[in-house]
Amino acid sequence: VPNLRTRERIPELMDDPGLDPAEHRRALAGLARLNRFSGSVGALWPSVRALALELKRPVRLLDVATGSGDVPRALLARAARAKIALEIEACDISATAVDEAARETSAIRFFAHDAVRNPLPSGFDVVTCSLFLHHLSEDEAVALLANMAAAARHLILVNDLARSRFNYAAVWVACRVLSRSPVVRFDGPASVRSAFAPAEALNLAERAGLSGATVRGRFPCRFLLAWERR
């Protein structure tokens, strides 16, 4: 297990624009399995549900860096079971990811967008992001958080890996058990080495102007950063 006291950004194979589209799609499927196993939706849903009950109207949600769209699809399914009206849009910088996501459902509008370098469309109640923050430099992460906050009327939620030796070992094993994709098997452990510790994530939120943001650990291997507009 490498020394994880400090962050070490490791270029991930899925970020390579030259990655074969078929291999990219296999990796997206593997990542979706890991998301189901690790409870990405379970981290986000309680806050989304609470906001819906408070607003007493349909909630508009934007999911950023959505990948294959598995997280917003699962949120939509939970909302349907709870009889909560949820209107979702989702974006990703990758055209391959957007095409793959759109193939799975017509109930969510997917679009290509660089959420770090360009402002996000406005008018959303909540803006979410899962497993993307660790791909970014500190300055890029601050820009992303600021863009998310500017687009959100009420709430932003960022669900990401937390850097620790235990989490590195757990992700290494999970990637080999849950996926045969060589991209996932490389990128998973690399992601933990690139990840922020919870205290570092809170510092990024403060730099982005998110006064009152909170960061809480989530089992397994994650933290949830939340900020509510006051």
Model-derived segments and their meaning:
Residues 17, 21-47, 51-52:
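Class I SAM-dependent methyltransferase Rossmann-like catalytic core
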Residues 1-17:
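N-terminal auxiliary segments of SAM/dcSAM-dependent transferases
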Residues 128:
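A conserved beta-strand element that flanks and buttresses the S-adenosyl-L-methionine
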